[in-house]
Amino acid sequence: MVITIAGGGSTFTAGIVKSIALRREELEVDEIRLFDINKERQDKVAVVVDWVLHKELNTDIKLVVTTDVQQAYTDASFVFAQMRVGGYAMREQDEKLPLRHGCVGQETCGCGGMAYGMRTIFPMIKLIDDVEKYAKKDYWILNYSNPAAIVSEACRKLRPKARIINICDMPIAIIDVVAAAMGIQNKKEIVYDYFGLNHFGWFTSIQYHGEDLMPKLRAYIKENKILLPESYLKGMGALTSSSSQNRHTKGSWYYVWKGEYEIMENFPEYLPNTYLNYYLQAKEFVEHSDPNHTRANEVEETREKNLFDGIDHYLKTGEVDANTFYAGSHGDWIADLSAALKNDTKARFLIITENRGAIPNMPYDAMVELPAYIGKNGPEVIARDNIPLFQQGLMMQQLNSEKLLVEGCVEGSYEKVLQAFTLNKTVPSMNVAKAILDDMIEANKGYWPELH
């Protein structure tokens, strides 16, 4: 079986490949292909991938590294999509430009997320068309390109029959943190319920061996005033710089996890996705953001630098620090999902899917994030009761903003894109929305379609 990773130059690629290789018997994979339009970057990452496959794990999996679409997708069974259109240079614009107007500057939320979405819609549609043309007829695309909410809505609208499952690892990262906070060794034994949109949802239940963990979690968060356990805080240097309130010192993620405490002080019933901070505490997040040093800069100075410094060191000395080659835990998540699809396991995963009545008081065609059982025919979504009015109201505002953005992008409609920016909860007024949009149009020349 062939698995292709589209966006092979990503810092996450080595970790994903390792997860695939560790499941090589389950997946029956004999070839992994890396595909990217940035040859220089991908060639460097491929050095690490080759080491993982043929030295660390000593597999006989064939590695193909290409910039050619036909070579990348021919006879592929799975395509993992992790594109970042515009790279970190454009991510930096997405984050810093809204901050100049007093609005949240974030990769996937608010105006920055909408800018990123506008750049990604048509490249994702091209990827689907290329895969349809060259891959096996029963292919699956597993897409975790951000912003997943906007991308999944565009796929639903423009390529409704595509065999694509849109996923996000942030809820899984939250469960990782919950497991650490609760002292649970095997996070796979945690069972949870969740509803929302992508980067816009809530855990309604978290159980371990039948025990409801929510009361313990609420108490833990209230006592510590943050969800992160001490080991995580030490890892980001937060415990050594407690007097500073600058994001550059502690890292922007510290405030996102601290925001879990602040949200639950007011709305304690559900555990929120960390991204809800940008909507429910937009003013506060702008106030302690550094407009000259955002998350894009942090990533370039840490994950990016560590990976490519590690590659250079390996090429010069032959010495390997494997810790520099792995970033995040979503490789396991994606590989497990692939195994469920291939082997019809009916394992439970959280996915982004068309609602189709699963949440009765949300639109039928809304792209929602819900648990589903995954088998060879795709997801079987787990339906639930009506959601509370507060969450429904927030979700409808966000959903309609995303739908208008996709419509505006596809139609080339300036008015609809402006409506999307205006409707977004991170933007205080129509005039601010217009000022940001006009600046975004200038910054995204060559990436966005023309708007009239």
What spans do the regions from the language model cover?
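Rossmann-fold NAD(P)-binding glycine/threonine-rich loop
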Residues: 89-158
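Extreme N-terminal starter segment of soluble prokaryotic enzymes
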Residues: 1-3
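Long, compositionally biased stretches enriched for glycine and/or charged residues
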Residues: 183-452
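A structured beta-alpha segment of the ubiquitous adenosine-cofactor-binding alpha/beta core
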Residues: 54-78, 85, 104-111, 124-135
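Glycine-rich phosphate-binding loop and adjoining beta1-alpha1-beta2 segment
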Residues: 25-58
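Conserved glycine-rich cofactor-binding loop
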Residues: 9
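Acidic, His- and aromatic-enriched active-site or binding-groove loops in soluble protein domains
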Residues: 161-178
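N-terminal Rossmann-fold NAD(P) dinucleotide-binding loop
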Residues: 13-14
